[in-house]
Amino acid sequence: MINQQNTSNNVIQELQNQIGEKIITSFDMVAQDRSNYFAKNPYQHQRPSIESANSIVNGYAKCNGGISAAANLVPGPLGMLAVAPEIITVMRNQIAMIYDVGVAYDKQQYLNKELLAGVLISSLGTGLITPGINAIANRVIIAQGSKIIARKVSTPIFQDTARWIAGKYAQQVLKSSVSKWLPGVGATAMGLWSAYSTKQVGNKSIQIFEKEIEILDDTQSLNECSIEYTDNFLPPSDIEVNNITGERLELLKIKTLINLMKVDGSIEPEEKEYLKTIITNANLTSAEIQEIKNSLSVQRIEVDYSLIAKYPDDALGLLIDLIALAKRDGDFHITEKMYIKQVGKLMGFSEVDVAELMLSC
């Protein structure tokens, strides 16, 4: 279990490095590109409006979903390194989307790299600026009543912020078991993640740009600060998860996938092969494997989804896996939809979020 966790952490670190170095310069590059575009199209009827904000978001979400769904996945965590270029493209499109939404809300004069990064960071939580990521978000963006303050920071601080964002994205991508081990179905899972995350970024952009924006130059006062973006934000080890939940997350996820396969009355041979691949690579103990074998004859396995809900990235990864598996044959059964909606609700997702995910890709 420890070896697999080390491998996963190493892959996250490498993905973070590959994505981070490209994303550091992407904020300024994309902002300049979009600024040039709107300078060439200066007339009001050529510019996005508040009324078009949702269609802007939907357009980028569809585009990003298609990019990731076409990715050529290789089995195993190390194979996920091959999709770094697609992840970078998705993130750049998300930055462009934030800029376009900002223009729609007539906030173009405030759209510097710090504000763009702050919107992206805030979309990784559940509130406007979620307390759990305040330590990072507050470097570049602060919610103060009805006002949003974007803080101009020094180059080293911004670079650390961009690397943290890259690490968070790498961590989210690797939460999908289907993406890692079932390339044929995994491409669908990647497409779902890209479309969903883009929609989340877009919705957060609208929420933020509805407010008053102010720019604060903090390059001097924050010059000596640094962000601890590596150790504190890597996923907890299997042992830590076991101590917290009493049952490892991977086992809970597999039980949930089995329930999905059983929802139409029986587990098909193809589904058994999928299950075998995931179990083999989950690095389960012999006792856990035996528990799974025993549960195959049970009509429905009991799973405490509140335990998974404590880990939002894992919960999202599981929800995406469920939808990708259900859609694999092109026939998304009503019983599968009902089960996924129920699981999503128990893990804390809104009906709207689950519905949007099921409609993606």
Task: Describe the predicted segments one by one.
Residues I2-Q5, G66, D100, I133-T155, ...:
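Small-residue-enriched hydrophobic alpha-helices in membranes
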